[in-house]
Amino acid sequence: MVQKTSMSRGPYPSSQEIPMEVFDPSPQGKYSKRKGRFKRSDGSTSSDTTSNSFVRQGSAESYTSRPSDSDVSLEEDREALRKEAERQALAQLEKAKTKPVAFAVRTNVGYNPSPGDEVPVQGVAITFEPKDFLHIKEKYNNDWWIGRLVKEGCEVGFIPSPVKLDSLRLLQEQKLRQNRLSSSKSGDNSSSSLGDVVTGTRRPTPPASAKQKQKSTEHVPPYDVVPSMRPIILVGPSLKGYEVTDMMQKALFDFLKHRFDGRISITRVTADISLAKRSVLNNPSKHIIIERSNTRSSLAEVQSEIERIFELARTLQLVALDADTINHPAQLSKTSLAPIIVYIKITSPKVLQRLIKSRGKSQSKHLNVQIAASEKLAQCPPEMFDIILDENQLEDACEHLAEYLEAYWKATHPPSSTPPNPLLNRTMATAALAASPAPVSNLQGPYLASGDQSLERATGEHASVHEYPGELGQPPGLYPSSHPPGRAGTLRALSRQDTFDADTPGNRNSAYTELGDSCVDMETDPSEGPGLGDPAGGSTPPARQGSWEDEEEDYEEELTDNRNRGRNKARYCAEGGGPVLGRNKNELEGWGRGVYIR
């Protein structure tokens, strides 16, 4: 009976097997064998299970074995588009190498590219740190600029725009929040309670400071627009407007004019550019306060001077500013100028005292003010200065400055970029001069372009030493001789006529050295009249720079014998006592006669 039932059930699976083989005849032998194996292992047939497994397996194979033509075509299209975009980006990068610099920025944040940043060309993004300088050539798209890091050996690449940096910052903050949440959830109760206790003990003071830091970081932009070439500004050894400081800075200006002839623009700035703070210029409510205060410069004059400096820097020439009002690096720390601060340092206060006293009573009576200003500069950390010139010999200090500026020139002028057009530079400098305000109208166009005119100081006075780090009410500075200052007292700086009275006629006839046989056209103020050069007010004959070792009796004879600038042995800073300075007390005056600020 059992056999009959088994025999009667036999045709059913065979009848079920036929349509399956018709549906898919190709795997007939394989699946027939598989079914035979099931029969031998089990006493009864399991055709339902076999057929179900067959259908499931067949459907999976049909799904995976069917390559989606649309997916393949999409992938190919995406790859082709990516390669084409990369090719165009590389071509645009290559063209940007010879394009002029559109503008420059100073970074407030750092950037290290990662694969997920979607750089137009992988591996060509620029890495930079905070306080680096970037030359921007052009805008590639809304997320990326094309430019280069101002550093020797760096080529053009892709720089994230402020929009891109903000988006990357937001993504990073989201990841940090998620990590904190996951770490807090994974922590056990004991660690969380311990963390609460620790944070509870710190809650009284830090939250306010943390909020302040958060606000300050939120409002800081990633980039600050700065001049394409950082302007060079000299400070020290004491206050400007006094003979010792003026003649030392004048010697360096003379050196720069000849060493970088054709590559430097030297211009005088009489406006108080320390007022050009971003917080002041961007806040209209502060404009009224400054306009009402007793300042020597209006905001319109300051803004005009800043624009003129930016225009001069666009030529990619070196720009040196003879700024009357800048005596401390803190005055420019919050401006957009980002200058190269050169600190002329006299290490020994005794040497500075001897130099001041050697200039006569007119300078000695202001000894305390100058010493206090020198001490104020000496207290600054070295990070506030780009170059510190503390050499004893003038020529050593000049070479130190020249090495720094040569390196900066190479960093701003890579070999791949085309050299600037001298005619364009001269035209732009002259145009910038024409747009300059009245206080700097005495500047000459050729002097801005190639440094052919002499520098000039105006009669004026200085504020107290404690005022020059940037107080808005009483900014320091020089006042034009045609506008006598309203303040007077022991802190009043000497007028130019006062300083000349302390010198001999031979001192007033001396001038700085000119290369070759060229003459120097002396500029004079209306209040001075003749007396800087010859009695008729003409030009001063070229002379070599004096040395502290020159004897007073031999000075007039040496002026006619030695006119070679290369033989200059002038020493502008010395350490120690008398034996280091020279042979007698009169040798301190040789500096002032050989190189005198006009």
UniProtKB/Swiss-Prot annotation:
Q: Where is the composition biased (Acidic residues)?
A: 548-559
Reply yes or no: does the keyword Cell division apply.
no
| Extent of Low complexity compositional bias | 43-53, 182-193
Q: Per its UniProt entry, which superkingdom is the organism in?
A: Eukaryota
Annotated localization: Cell membrane, Sarcolemma; Cell membrane
Cellular component GO terms held in the UniProt record: sarcolemma; synapse; voltage-gated calcium channel complex
Q: What is its main location?
A: membrane
The record's listing under InterPro entries reads: CAB1-4_N_A-dom (IPR046937), GK/Ca_channel_bsu (IPR008145), P-loop_NTPase (IPR027417), SH3-like_dom_sf (IPR036028), SH3_domain (IPR001452), VDCC_L_b1su (IPR005443), VDCC_L_bsu (IPR000584)
* Annotated spans, Disordered: 1-79, 179-223, 466-586
Q: Which GO terms describe its biological process?
A: calcium ion transport; chemical synaptic transmission
Give every SH3 domain span: 100-169
Q: Which Pfam families match?
A: Guanylate_kin, VGCC_beta4Aa_N
Q: Where is the PTM Phosphoserine found along the chain? A: S44, S47, S73, S186, S193, S547
GO MF annotations in UniProt: calcium channel activity; high voltage-gated calcium channel activity
| Topological type in the membrane | Peripheral membrane protein
- Report keywords, A-Z: Calcium, Calcium channel, Calcium transport, Cell membrane, Ion channel, Ion transport, Membrane, Phosphoprotein, SH3 domain, Transport, Voltage-gated channel
Q: In the UniProt record, does the keyword Ubl conjugation occur?
A: no
Q: Which residues carry this modification: Phosphothreonine?
A: T499
Record field: compositional bias (Polar residues): 1-17, 54-71
Quaternary structure, per UniProt, is: Regulatory subunit of L-type calcium channels that consist of a pore-forming alpha subunit and auxiliary beta, gamma and delta subunits. Interacts with CACNA1A, CACNA1B, CACNA1C and CACNA1S. Component of a calcium channel complex consisting of a pore-forming alpha subunit (CACNA1S) and the ancillary subunits CACNB1 or CACNB2, CACNG1 and CACNA2D1. Identified in a complex with CACNA1C. Identified in a complex with the L-type calcium channel subunits CACNA1C, CACNA2D1, CACNB1 and one of the gamma subunits (CACNG4, CACNG6, CACNG7, or CACNG8).
Q: Family, per the entry? A: Belongs to the calcium channel beta subunit family.
Q: What is this protein called?
A: Voltage-dependent L-type calcium channel subunit beta-1
Species assigned in the record: Bos taurus
* Lineage, opening ranks: Eukaryota, Metazoa, Chordata, Craniata, Vertebrata
